[in-house]
UniProtKB/Swiss-Prot annotation:
Positions bound to S-adenosyl-L-methionine: R505, G506, W507, D541, Y543, R593, N596, H597
SMART domains per UniProt: PreSET (SM00468), SET (SM00317), SRA (SM00466)
EC number: 2.1.1.368
The protein's name: Histone-lysine N-methyltransferase, H3 lysine-9 specific SUVH1
Residue ranges occupied by any Pre-SET domain in the UniProt entry: 432-492
Domain annotation SET: ranges: 495-639
Biological source species: Arabidopsis thaliana
Amino acid sequence: MERNGGHYTDKTRVLDIKPLRTLRPVFPSGNQAPPFVCAPPFGPFPPGFSSFYPFSSSQANQHTPDLNQAQYPPQHQQPQNPPPVYQQQPPQHASEPSLVTPLRSFRSPDVSNGNAELEGSTVKRRIPKKRPISRPENMNFESGINVADRENGNRELVLSVLMRFDALRRRFAQLEDAKEAVSGIIKRPDLKSGSTCMGRGVRTNTKKRPGIVPGVEIGDVFFFRFEMCLVGLHSPSMAGIDYLVVKGETEEEPIATSIVSSGYYDNDEGNPDVLIYTGQGGNADKDKQSSDQKLERGNLALEKSLRRDSAVRVIRGLKEASHNAKIYIYDGLYEIKESWVEKGKSGHNTFKYKLVRAPGQPPAFASWTAIQKWKTGVPSRQGLILPDMTSGVESIPVSLVNEVDTDNGPAYFTYSTTVKYSESFKLMQPSFGCDCANLCKPGNLDCHCIRKNGGDFPYTGNGILVSRKPMIYECSPSCPCSTCKNKVTQMGVKVRLEVFKTANRGWGLRSWDAIRAGSFICIYVGEAKDKSKVQQTMANDDYTFDTTNVYNPFKWNYEPGLADEDACEEMSEESEIPLPLIISAKNVGNVARFMNHSCSPNVFWQPVSYENNSQLFVHVAFFAISHIPPMTELTYDYGVSRPSGTQNGNPLYGKRKCFCGSAYCRGSFG
């Protein structure tokens, strides 16, 4: 008991208070009782009802905080002598909703069954039917990334996170393709894969920082915005400006960490090392300004970075012609030199920032702009020997270039697109193909070709390989599905390749185009040989592919646990070929003969079988392990011969010295 102003209060009665969510409403008795009303916290409300604290403030001042991004910086007073960009007073942040889509919005909400119209309310709600949802948290899944590595990454970890994300994305795309198309539903397996990786800790560089990001290199390419988020290069999944709040002289203030120049605004500049960047906001859609931009959030952060001389990471967004999508190239650090306000094409004020690339960095965007000029022929490629060494055999030209010495080209060979098999190398008996009309539909188990692939279509809708398998079975030319997408390796080269002279490894192969992980590059063309008959001549043949070699194992497929699948369903990634296959491209071959060995390759080989001239043969197809930037040499692991044994404790010791220069170089191959 406690005395208070002459009265006694029994405090034990106060301690028995229950949370509001445990109380049940008490309805008045009688037929004239008013109906029970349920209305949104911001209204509208029926007559006689009003909101209660904390929802009593105006709706305009309410917004959902973005838990994945830094909160809006506090308002700063306008200085007495502002620069041109400060000519407008910044409005209150609360009146402008966040442009960044929270990652939690990609998860499906837990809803009730059926439809309901609330009696006595002016608001009608349609409650969708309950459906199973995937939880991003899985107590049984271990990401394998500790807290320290999650905050600060390295090159190996960055590549691992990107590979795991894309493997999961390809699996989700495969599952979506197998479903019936629903009108108005846009399939975004990248968002689903990204939110899953975020929720389960498959990410790195979560500690936001300006400047260099550990493990991310200049020239790295990304095909999805979520990839940049997972490796800490650029956190927002939609906004073009990323920033963090730091302590200023008198108060906290935002500084920009990175920007994405998506090309939606007038950002083009003749000099590839200079970027005129348009601020964010004021746009109803991506093509047209609808109102004046405001000095807040990212725009304010860029202005503060200008005053602090703080470098900003720049990611260039480019159009990918082959898939009608965007590709992003990390172009390094830029310094903000000046800012101003000008009228845009739509007549509204926009903030402009001039950024200049820091000197001493390797080229990235500049190389891409040079490649676009090479494709037009003006100017011509420096060191060009032949514009098309295939003489039109390939649908896309393959250039021959030497910028190293005076060598005019490799030794003569016949260019071909098909493997030459003798009668003794028909590896399998022909089988009946499918009877699908026009194309094989993913998920159709009546298709003979899909059944041979284990019930799953081996490629996504845009021709990307989903998983490595012991063998992939493609539809043959004799199948009636003329427009089938299960003929990826039979369609020839689809990227602009270049054979070039290397500094210390002879001729090599690279691409003018960025190559997406899982993309088909080419098959290995040559003459099939009997290993027992060519054992002696193989030592003098630098253009031999041997499927019997021993290769370093590596993990490329998706993780069933990350996809909420049974781990026992994980398929083998080891190739299985019925008979030893050796292909010599010394006299007859294609561009594959110029791919050099690397102990850390960016390309892998996959056995593919399809019928040709009423006989089934195995072909060696090459696919990209990861995203490959333009002008990066394409390499694969040659492996070592099985009888080589061990040397210096290394079971993979080959006959030839390796010059790949990789940090994981084993010193030899072949």
